[in-house]
Amino acid sequence: MKEFKIGLLLLTLIIAMLYFTEKFTSNNDIKPVRNLAYESNEELKPYINKFFRDLNNHGINKSIPKDFIFKFSDLESNKTTSHYHGVSLGHDDDDKVEIYINKNSWSSFNKTQRYYIVYHELSHDILNLDDLSENEANYGKIMYPSISKYDNLKMNDFVKNMKDLFKSL
């Protein structure tokens, strides 16, 4: 019984250490992303407005939270986010949206990819959805994690996948 209690105590300590290490690391990773951000409302606003219109058209009544940040950021300048196209920081917090889009990715993306990245990141923060696994069956879906692979998809593909996502909720 004593060995069980010691094992349980060690397991609890390990879990606590992992939790606080992740929490501390995540906060340190976020600061540079915020510092590298800049205003981009005019370019992103039409995509954001379309997302909320599409939600409403599919019977999903979500409003824009008061704490709403959606900006471009030089994510490639930060070692921990250099390979990200976008970062969503308001997942599981319905009162907050905090999203940063890699400006270089945005510049290289076609129109369809731009819609995918905006809907993908907003689906994390507004709908609290997780990424899908990166396998062939999920290719084309909004929550697929590799938007850069969507350079051959057209707006019709996006519209179909957006409707499929919203109907599944």
Name each model feature, range by range.
Residues 122-138:
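Catalytic Zn2+-binding segment of zinc metalloproteases
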Residues 8-19:
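Hydrophobic membrane-insertion alpha-helices, especially the h-region
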Residues 82-111, 125, 140-148:
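Active-site scaffold of zinc-dependent metalloenzymes
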Residues 44-92:
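Auxiliary, metal-adjacent structural segments of Zn-dependent hydrolase domains
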Residues 1-6:
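Positively charged n-region of N-terminal signal peptides that target proteins for export
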